[in-house]
Amino acid sequence: MMNNNNLQHNQFFTIEQDFSPEKITDAERLVMECFSHIYANWADEKNLSREAEELRVGEIKGFKNILLSPWTLSDVTIEWDYWESVLRHRYKTQNGDGYVQIIWDRRGWLTDLLCVMKPVTRAEALTVCKWLLACDYFEERDSLFDCIILNLVGECEE
């Protein structure tokens, strides 16, 4: 059963029928309002160093203080698909370099959640497993894929 927080999250991270690559989504707008100093010139050489990367990731923390957080693994997959769709549109038009980095940063945080957030039910674990198998992103990332699968089935002693 979906609680009100799930519903709010999933409605917020839904691609609208009239979505266009030129339009900045509400989620992107919220992030830029808080972190424009980080993303305005993110492609500058000084911002591409490992130190700058670590500072940025440490400061943003997946934007969990400004964007709705997923409550279940199903919510994580819904949001992942949302960002995947936005990313496809951004690359198609090459619109907004800083916005592409926002997407990668949020997806990195969502990926961490896939590795640690426990499924609510066996049915959810199975649904997320099927989603994972269909998601191209995880194809060449064996250790990450394994980590998520172990989270879904529960780790056992050898």
Label the predicted regions:
Residues M1-E158:
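Sequence/structural signature of long amphipathic alpha-helices
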